[in-house]
């Protein structure tokens, strides 16, 4: 704790509070999450929630530009503290800010960073299981990073089962709504498809009020799942037969979207999980190589409420970096002066030559 100056409380989560702090040695602004240690159900003997431990383990192993960076872990007064890079806002704030006009190039940039982050997770056998706009955080440089790995799980073991009660309901895949306990990375891809739609619509695509209503919303938008378009669906534990309903063509809903964007989202929002596109294949989709080039992250729009504080933080960061650079230069100059002030060693050959000359 001595390494940090705690400045202000900035949030509170399920397992603790989050404060803004500064690293004393460097001036770096960070976020410190304090994990509460209270002995309740589903916790270790030390009183730390299993989800918090799982999040720590996963973030220690996952190092990627589009995954939030866990910088430090320490204990203080019987509490555990996680130190993260400070993120400025989340994607939900961008979507809801009506002063922002999201251009196709902006959406492409968000989607590219989101897919890069989840591809890194899946490559390391991690399911996020709770992708939604307010879990996608933005850095001071405009980089999108996946956060909140409290529901994340390692996958890949044969017959491994999970709870279907994962993922916020707007972004929950149909196999989870039907009670599947064995599933894979396709649940994250479904969530990303819903986020893609939300970026284009500026409102949640499938805003259900409960599991049954969520399934109704899905059927209304995408048609009705059956053994023809999803073999095995009728065998899922909580399968319910819905009235046959035709799908609404994506082009009819996303009128301004390119053909490539329509094709990509249609491959993400397929009923059959086995047929959904993978994150790696999505990154190689023509959507990212055709049409407008994605916006540079540093040029992405900033929520109106964050502009003033962001400018101030960038100025402070620039000043701190300048001070650190000057300090390094001074240290280098001092080292050079010390080297120059040291007397040159006397060469033995020169001494012998001088003695011989004196004898002559």
From Swiss-Prot:
PROSITE patterns in alphabetical order: PROTEIN_KINASE_ATP, PROTEIN_KINASE_DOM, PROTEIN_KINASE_ST
GO BP terms, alphabetized: cell division; meiotic cell cycle; positive regulation of transcription by RNA polymerase II; regulation of cell cycle
Residue ranges annotated for the Protein kinase domain, each copy included: 4-288
UniProt modified residues of type Phosphoserine: 157, 163
Top EC class of this enzyme: transferase
One Pfam family, short name: Pkinase
InterPro entries, A to Z: CDK, CDK7, Kinase-like_dom_sf, Prot_kinase_dom, Protein_kinase_ATP_BS, Ser/Thr_kinase_AS
Superkingdom, natural source: Eukaryota
Keywords: ATP-binding, Cell cycle, Cell division, Kinase, Meiosis, Nucleotide-binding, Nucleus, Phosphoprotein, Serine/threonine-protein kinase, Transferase
Cellular component terms per the entry's GO annotation: cytoplasm; nucleus; transcription factor TFIIK complex
Protein purpose: Catalytic part of CAK which activates cyclin-associated CDK1/CDK2/CDK4 by threonine phosphorylation, thereby allowing MPF activation.
Name this polypeptide is given: Cyclin-dependent kinase 7
Organism: Dictyostelium discoideum
């Amino acid at each position: 704790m001595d390494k940090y100056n705690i400045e202000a409380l900035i949030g509170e989560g399920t397992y603790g509070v989050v404060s803004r702090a500064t690293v004393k040695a460097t001036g770096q602004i960070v976020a410190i999450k304090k994990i509460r240690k209270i002995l309740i159900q589903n916790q270790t003997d030390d009183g730390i929630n299993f989800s918090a431990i799982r999040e720590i383990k996963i973030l220690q192993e996952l190092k990627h530009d589009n995954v939030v960076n866990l910088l430090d872990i320490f204990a203080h007064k019987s509490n555990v503290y996680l130190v993260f890079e400070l993120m400025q806002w989340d994607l939900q704030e961008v979507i809801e800010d009506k002063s922002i006009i999201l251009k196709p190039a902006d959406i492409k940039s968000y989607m590219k960073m989101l897919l890069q982050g989840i591809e890194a997770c899946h490559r390391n056998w991690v399911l996020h299981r709770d992708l939604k706009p307010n879990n996608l955080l933005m850095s001071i440089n405009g980089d999108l990073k996946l956060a909140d790995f409290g529901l994340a799980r390692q996958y890949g073991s044969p017959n491994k089962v999970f709870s279907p009660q994962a993922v916020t309901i707007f972004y929950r895949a149909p196999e989870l709504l039907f009670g599947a306990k064995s599933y894979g990375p396709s649940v994250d891809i479904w969530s990303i498809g819903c986020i893609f739609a939300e970026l284009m619509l500026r409102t949640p695509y499938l805003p259900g009020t409960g599991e049954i209503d969520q399934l109704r919303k899905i059927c209304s938008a995408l048609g009705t799942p059956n053994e023809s378009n999803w073999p095995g669906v009728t065998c899922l534990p909580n399968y319910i037969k819905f009235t046959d309903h035709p799908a609404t063509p994506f082009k009819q809903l996303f009128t301004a979207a390119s053909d490539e964007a329509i094709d990509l989202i249609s491959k993400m929002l397929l009923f059959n999980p086995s047929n959904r596109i993978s994150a790696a294949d999505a990154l190689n989709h023509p959507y990212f190589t055709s049409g407008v080039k994605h916006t540079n992250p540093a040029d992405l729009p900033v929520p109106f409420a964050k502009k003033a504080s962001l400018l101030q933080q960038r100025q402070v960061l620039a000043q701190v970096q300048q001070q650190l650079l000057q300090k390094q230069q001074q240290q280098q100059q001092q080292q050079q002066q010390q080297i120059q002030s040291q007397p040159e060693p006397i060469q033995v050959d020169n001494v012998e030559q001088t003695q011989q000359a004196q004898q002559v």
